[in-house]
Regions:
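Iron-sulfur-associated redox domains of electron-transfer enzymes in respiratory
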Residues: 21-122
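Short, well-structured beta-strand-loop connectors
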Residues: 2-15, 34
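Short, solvent-exposed loop/turn positions at domain surfaces
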Residues: 1, 18-21
């Protein structure tokens, strides 16, 4: 990813490199203006991709093909969750694939995901 690159919404713009990181995808279509260091709320620094919105949204508001996740084995399902950058939104945004990996030793008949973790209005 470099300044001047065109991105589509949903395109991978940052790949997880460490155990507690997650893949990051572009929220909008546009042109990468710069990659710069930013300060996170907890005081850490990280690189950020600054995107100037330009072009058409080709995913937002459209029905996308469903993943046939029901036929995936546990390892493939964890890989899909990791590739999509799913993280918990609690106090510490832990990558969901890491949390699920911890419970892989036992057999799981039902998996319940709280899609609104820490939401005060629910």
């Amino acid at each position: 990813m470099h300044a001047g690159d065109r991105v589509r919404e949903g395109q991978l713009v940052g790949r997880a490199e460490a155990g507690e990181s997650a893949n990051v995808h572009a929220p909008i279509p546009g042109i990468v203006r710069e990659i710069r260091s930013i300060l996170l709320p907890g005081g850490d620094r990280t690189d950020a991709v600054v995107i100037d919105m330009e072009g058409e949204f080709d995913r937002l508001g459209k029905q996308l093909p469903a993943h046939e996740w029901q036929s995936l084995d546990p390892a493939a399902l964890l890989r899909l969750i990791r590739e999509h950058g799913v993280v918990g939104m609690g106090g510490v945004p832990t990558p969901t694939h890491r949390s699920l990996k911890l419970s892989r030793d036992g057999r799981c008949e039902t998996l319940v995901l709280n899609g609104a973790e820490s939401e005060p209005y629910l």
